[in-house]
C-alpha cells in the first residue's frame, strides 16, 4: 500500500491553471498533488548568436526553487553566485524535452524561454515542470499565431513527463517525496503524445533493478503520461 492510498499506476491529482500570470505570452500553474510549479513562456524576436541567419528558432528553459519550497529553507542560488549542478541538469532536461516537441525551422528566428519556478516541492518537480511547460509553450505559440508572429503552429504534439520507481518491491507511478526518498529505484520518463520517448533517466538508489522491472516501470510511465496528456488537452480546450 502506498502512503497516499493510490494504486501502483495512479498519478496524483493534476491541475493545470492557464493564464496564471498577466505578462507572459504563456503561463501555467501546474500541480501534481502537493508539488506546485509556475511555468511562464516568454517570446523574444531574436535567437542565440550562433543561430543568427540560419532561419531557425530556439526553445530554452530555466528552473529554480523558492527557498521554502521544501521542508527546510534552502539558500537562494543567486546568493552563492552560481547555479547548482542539479538545477542545471533539470533545466537542460526541460529544454531538451520542449525542443523535441517543436519544429525549430517553422518557429523562424524567434526564441521562447520557459521559466519553471517551484513554489512547493513534494517529489517530481522536474516532471511537473515539463508537463506545465508544454502547456505554457502551447499558449505562447498560440499567442504568436494570433499576433501574426507565426503563420502556422510549429508544435509537433504534446510532451509530458512522470516519475516511476520501485517502492517496497513494487513498480509505482508518480512518486511523492516520501516514496522517492525511500525508493529502491527512481526513474524519470519524458514522452511525446505519440508514445515516442524523449528521455529516460533511471538510477538504482538502494538495489539494482531487473530487466522485467524496467519494462514494468516503462509501461507504468506510458500509462501515466497518457493520462497526463489528456489533462493537458483538456486544459488547453478550456
UniProtKB/Swiss-Prot annotation:
Q: Which GO terms describe its molecular function?
A: 3'-5'-RNA exonuclease activity; tRNA binding; tRNA nucleotidyltransferase activity
Supply the alphabetized keyword list.
Answer: Nucleotidyltransferase, RNA-binding, rRNA processing, Transferase, tRNA processing, tRNA-binding
Which Pfam families does the record associate with it? RNase_PH, RNase_PH_C
Which branch of life, at top level?
Bacteria
List the EC numbers from the record.
2.7.7.56
The answer to whether UniProt assigns keyword Magnesium to this entry is no
Give the record's subunit note.
Answer: Homohexameric ring arranged as a trimer of dimers.
Q: Which family does it belong to?
A: Belongs to the RNase PH family.
Q: What is this protein called?
A: Ribonuclease PH
Please state the gene responsible for encoding this protein.
rph
Amino acid at each position: 500500500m502506498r502512503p497516499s492510498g493510490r494504486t501502483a499506476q495512479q498519478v496524483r491529482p493534476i491541475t493545470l491553471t492557464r493564464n496564471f500570470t498577466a505578462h507572459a505570452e504563456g503561463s501555467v500553474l501546474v500541480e501534481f498533488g502537493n508539488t506546485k510549479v509556475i511555468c511562464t513562456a516568454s517570446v523574444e524576436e531574436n535567437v542565440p548568436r550562433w543561430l543568427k541567419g540560419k532561419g531557425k528558432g530556439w526553445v530554452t528553459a530555466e528552473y529554480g526553487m523558492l527557498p521554502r519550497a521544501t521542508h527546510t529553507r534552502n539558500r537562494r542560488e543567486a546568493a552563492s553566485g552560481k547555479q547548482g549542478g542539479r538545477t542545471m541538469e533539470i533545466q537542460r532536461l526541460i529544454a531538451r524535452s520542449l525542443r523535441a516537441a517543436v519544429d525549430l525551422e517553422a518557429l523562424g528566428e524567434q526564441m521562447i524561454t520557459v521559466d519553471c519556478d517551484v513554489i512547493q516541492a513534494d517529489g517530481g518537480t522536474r516532471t511537473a515542470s515539463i508537463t506545465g511547460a508544454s502547456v505554457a509553450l502551447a499558449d505562447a505559440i498560440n499567442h504568436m499565431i494570433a499576433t501574426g508572429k507565426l503563420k502556422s503552429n510549429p508544435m509537433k504534439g504534446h510532451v509530458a513527463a512522470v516519475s516511476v520507481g520501485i517502492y517496497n518491491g513494487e513498480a509505482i507511478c508518480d512518486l511523492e517525496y516520501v516514496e522517492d526518498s525511500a525508493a529502491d529505484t527512481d526513474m524519470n520518463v519524458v514522452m511525446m503524445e505519440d508514445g515516442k520517448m524523449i528521455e529516460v533517466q533511471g538510477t538504482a538508489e538502494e538495489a539494482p533493478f531487473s530487466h522485467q522491472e524496467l519494462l514494468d516501470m516503462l509501461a507504468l510511465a506510458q500509462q501515466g503520461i497518457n493520462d497526463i496528456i489528456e489533462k493537458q488537452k483538456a486544459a488547453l480546450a478550456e
